[in-house]
Every structure is written in structure tokens, then in C-alpha cells.
Amino acid sequence: MKIDKTLVVKFGTSTLTQGSAKLNLPHMMDIVRQLAQLHQAGFRLVIVTSGAIAAGRHYLNHPQLPPTIASKQLLAAVGQSQLIQTWEKLFAIYDIHIGQILLTRADIEDRERFLNARDTLRALLDNQIIPVINENDAVATSEIKVGDNDNLSALVAILVQAEQLYLLTDQQGLFDRDPRKHPDAKLIADVDKITDHIRAIAGGSGTSLGTGGMSTKISAADVATRSGIETIIAPGNRPNVIVDLAYGQAIGTKFSVQADRLESRKQWLYAAPSAGIITIDAGAENAMLMQHKSLLPAGIVNVEGRFSRGEVVKIRTQQGKDVALGMPRYNSDALHLIQGKHSQDIEQVLGYEYGAVAVHRDDMIVL
């Protein structure tokens, strides 16, 4: 039986370089072997990868550049293509396709871009293609940067509704003291709640090659666990670490979820103001409530209010009962045009399409 579970795995620069000044191909080959094993077992995988700047520096033979943002962006621009080619060639050994996505904070904070990014990720995963994600360092300014791939990976985990997020690093996990200064430091195996004490012992930044230290990993774990995603900080150089984590072995530091994924989503939908009303027929009501199906345009009989794609709306029966809250894939103007029509007619009517459904079941809470 295949496993239906979504994992986001973040690889830091130190993990991919193994402490050197370039990508460590033998180590990356072993990483891909593990990911291929999980992919073939049915896990839905998303990679968040660092390493573009290190790859660019090596490709350009370690040029002497001033320590400016422009220099880093130059290295990222050159190195990103080298980095993605490396992932692509290694996955090709196992006949697995990957898809590159470069994100900035603006892509996540803007509703339309957020939905587009989410839909792209879903499409890749639904077609057994592994998304490989990095921040778009070559063009991002400080105002639109997420800032580090730890926090980016947490946001990506929310985008794809992952069950788990793995932050792989050059450390064994979170220790009660800095193990580089205190040889007797003890590994903290489980963190039930991220407190000020946990943040304090996380300390500052990590290696010089990357931008993320233990403190950014704690920040990422906080974001993810509040959204119902279990997060684990684990050593990227441990043999078979990804496979072992996926099958439940205790490695590194595990951060327990702070809220159930569905409950977290329910609270958000309940709290959001309703921007409009979609009235549905009896067939759509039965499909949604009894069969847990998405809402199709064919089942819509009326659309009230003006709303954008992704705003929260009430879904109401013809008897006037509110039965669900949802985030439609189309704005109110588009829904007016396609209501009552078959899904295959959407593109012909609108000139574009965001999928066959009006409101996806994953974006809907039944009341």
C-alpha cells in the first residue's frame, strides 16, 4: 500500500557542501537516493534547497568580490542554475522529474501570487514531480526577502499542507547549550512548546556559507508547528537520515504541533470576514456534505458580493442555510460567468482556467 504523506525537506548550505566550499556530489547523490526511495514508496516530497551562492562561487573559481548584496546576488544568479542542474542530473538517475520554483516574500504575502504558487506546487505533486524551491536571491531585495530558507521552508510546508518539515543541518539537533563551546551539552530530543528559554538557548547564526543558524530554525519550527506541522531538526550527514525520519525513527530534535492542522485552518476560515455568498443546488450540497467533494461550477446557482480569488465566502443552500466556508479559485465576476456550466467549458468561457473546481475541498470547511 502506498503512503499518502507530504514531507518538506530543507537542506542547508552546510549539509550540501559538507563543510567544503562547493557542493558535495557524493553526499548529494546519497540524499537523492533516500528521496527516490521515499518517492517510490508514495511520499509526496518537496525540497527547499540552499547552496546557490556556494555553487556560484565555485563555478566562478572563487572570485574576489566586494562584500555587497550585489555580489551575493551575482553569485546566486550564476549558482542557481548550477544547483538545479545538479539536482536534476541526480534525480534523472532514478527517472524522477523535478520542477524549480523560486520564491520571494511577495509571492507568499500577495493573495493572488500565494494561490498561484500553491496551485503550481499541487500540480507538480499531483503529477509525481518533486518541487525544488529556493528563495529568488538574484532579484530579491531586503524588503521582499523571507531572509533564510528555514523560514521559507516553513511557509512552503503550509502552502502544501505538509504533515512534517525536516530541517537538515550540520548540527545533531537543538542542545541545552552550544555544543561547540560546551562538550557536555545535551541534545534536547523533544520540544513540546517553543518558549523564550528555547529561543534563548538556540543562540545566533550558524556557518559563514549560509544565512540560517539554530535561531532561524526555531523560528521556522514555531511557524510550522502553529499550523499543525510537526518539525524536526536533524543532522544532514547522518546515514539514511531522511528515510529513517520518514518512517518514524527518533533523530535530532522533534517539535510537537501546537495546533491540529484542520483546527488551525478552521480557526483561520472562521475568523476571516466573509466577502460574499455562493448559493448551490441540491446535487452540489450532497456532493460536498455527504461525499466530501469539491464544489464544481455546475452546482452553483447564484453568486452574491464582489470578491477576489482566495477570499473567504459563505456557501449556502437554496433553502438559505450556510453549510460551508470556502476560498474560491475564481473571483466573483468569473464565477458569475461559469456558474451552472460544466468544468470543461471554463477555459472557453473565461479564456483561462485555474482548475476544474470552483472551491477545492482542501479550501473548504463544512459547518
Curated annotation (Swiss-Prot):
Disulfide bonds: none annotated. Residues 275-353 form the PUA domain. It comes from the Bacteria. GO terms for biological process: L-proline biosynthetic process. Substrate binds at residues 50, 137, 149. Gene3D superfamilies: Acetylglutamate kinase-like, PUA domain. Catalyzes the transfer of a phosphate group to glutamate to form L-glutamate 5-phosphate. This is Glutamate 5-kinase. The gene is proB.
